[in-house]
Amino acid sequence: MVVGFGAWWTYFDFAGQRRPRPEPVSTVQWLLGHLPLTAAVAAMGAAMVSLVDHAHDGRTPAATAWVLSAGAAVVLGTTMVVAASLQAWQDKRGLYRPLARTSAVAAVACLGVGAARPTPLVLGLALVLLLSIPWGFAVARRLAGGADPPGTPQA
């Protein structure tokens, strides 16, 4: 369940409850970006049943590991695709550009964890940790004052 919270925090902290820029391309990007995002969240939820069923196994079943790990990677990637359609993407470049790179690295690491197929507990904990990296990065960046303040001129 904590993996689901990680996906939820990733989306709602960076893209959720925000409208796209008032441009046709941004609107289409925002709409279509939500399709793989919601599919990944649903798939992750379905795979959690198998993760719990195999909680005492020495390795996570391959299908379960891949669905959970790929789902987490898709959530990280598509959240940034959706975020790129927002006005904040342009207004807060100092936050969102490095955040997108951090999310991409975390997404690749999610796939690596899935390929390794550790025990179900380790898989779940690893995905929670990886989903928290972009959030932790953004919090640290904001606390350090490294994000572009509102109204920063565009380059």
Predicted regions and their residues:
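Loop-to-transmembrane alpha-helix initiation sites
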Residues: 117-127
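Short, intrinsically disordered terminal tails adjacent to the first/last structured region
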Residues: 150-155
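Predominantly late transmembrane helices and immediately cytosolic-facing juxtamembrane segments
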Residues: 1-112, 129-149
